[in-house]
Amino acid sequence: MQVHDNHRRPLVSLRISVTGRCNVSCIYCHRDGILRSDEEMSPEDIENICRVASDLGVKKIRLSGGEPLIRDDIVEIVEKINSIGFRDISITTNGTLLEDLSVPLRDAGLDRVNVSFDTLKPETYRFITRKDYLERVKAGIEGAVMAGLDPVKINMVILRGVNHHEIWDMFEFCRQQGAVLQIIELLKTDSCPDNGVERYHCDITPIEAELAEMADRIMTRKFMQDRKKYFIGDGEVEVVRPMDNTRFCANCTRLRVTPDGKLKPCLLRNDNLVDTKEALSSGDLEGLRELFLEAIRRRSPYYQS
């Protein structure tokens, strides 16, 4: 069955944060809008979450964090999810551990990957992440492409005064790798401090205008919040706008899950979560289904600050 919320939006995708842990400390990180927790679901818990989601019509699963590849059992998690029969399984990662895991993850059933990578300059990478992992990330991107994960997308958060001047260099890097560049406008959430947004926020409207002028073709992704994709030669660029807007909400078909098993109806809210811990611990899949339906009922037609 395909469930819809009270605003006629189908539930198509599930984004599961499998851990709050990370091996870098990005200056802008909002941890997928999720508040800190030391608890993590087991692979079996994640499998049960996904089985119920599949029964309700979910077709796509994305794993995120924290840094999902930091989990020793991430390949097992992907295998369990893949056994259910989803149309698409993807991961968002910082890429530092991707080189050695690309093939095992592909063999486990992973379809594609998004790599958070904001700069090609070692000193800027160090400033953003507090680590010296730039070459490891490059190797991870190359490994993902060679493994046949498709598409490989590079998530570049634009930061004023930090990397806003590197967009075309990153576009060329992605084009040469056979990857898609995603330009992301900095997002404010409960877990991202206001002063960070004010300091680094860069309006990407002029960037998008430049892309439109240079593009050979422009495509609008209707079920991805009317996101624009620009085709320039043999390269591709997508633009991701902040999510606290009516267009984003009107086309939202996603539910999120926190590392400790709470269903999250809205990326930007933490006041309407649905806790599945008891149902997961007892293996009560029917109870878990009812909790999913409750989370779907709590979805709003637009973001309420």
From Swiss-Prot:
Residues that hold S-adenosyl-L-methionine according to the record: 28, 66, 116
Domain Radical SAM core: 6-228
Annotated GTP binding sites: 15, 62, 92, 153, 254-256
Pathway(s): Cofactor biosynthesis; molybdopterin biosynthesis
Signal peptide residue numbers: none
Keywords noted in UniProt: 4Fe-4S, GTP-binding, Iron, Iron-sulfur, Lyase, Metal-binding, Molybdenum cofactor biosynthesis, Nucleotide-binding, S-adenosyl-L-methionine
Residues that hold [4Fe-4S] cluster 1 according to the record: 22, 26, 29
Catalysed reactions listed for this entry: GTP + AH2 + S-adenosyl-L-methionine = (8S)-3',8-cyclo-7,8-dihydroguanosine 5'-triphosphate + 5'-deoxyadenosine + L-methionine + A + H(+)
A Pfam family annotated for this UniProt entry: Mob_synth_C
EC number(s) per entry: 4.1.99.22
CDD domains the record matches: Radical_SAM, Twitch_MoaA
Cofactor(s) required for function per UniProt: [4Fe-4S] cluster
One MF term in the entry's GO annotations: metal ion binding
Gene Ontology biological-process entries: Mo-molybdopterin cofactor biosynthetic process
Binding site for [4Fe-4S] cluster 2: 249, 252, 266
InterPro entries associated with the record: Aldolase_TIM, Elp3/MiaA/NifB-like_rSAM, MoaA_arc, MoaA_NifB_PqqE_Fe-S-bd_CS, MoaA_twitch, MoCo_biosynth_MoaA/MoaC, rSAM
UniProt keyword Iron present: yes
Top-rank lineage group of the source organism: Archaea
UniProt-listed PROSITE patterns: MOAA_NIFB_PQQE, RADICAL_SAM
Note accompanying the cofactor annotation: Binds 2 [4Fe-4S] clusters. Binds 1 [4Fe-4S] cluster coordinated with 3 cysteines and an exchangeable S-adenosyl-L-methionine and 1 [4Fe-4S] cluster coordinated with 3 cysteines and the GTP-derived substrate.
NCBIfam families reported in the protein's UniProt record: moaA_archaeal, PRK00164.2-1
Protein family according to the UniProt entry: Belongs to the radical SAM superfamily. MoaA family.
Function summary: Catalyzes the cyclization of GTP to (8S)-3',8-cyclo-7,8-dihydroguanosine 5'-triphosphate.
Name by which UniProt lists this protein: Probable GTP 3',8-cyclase
Gene: moaA
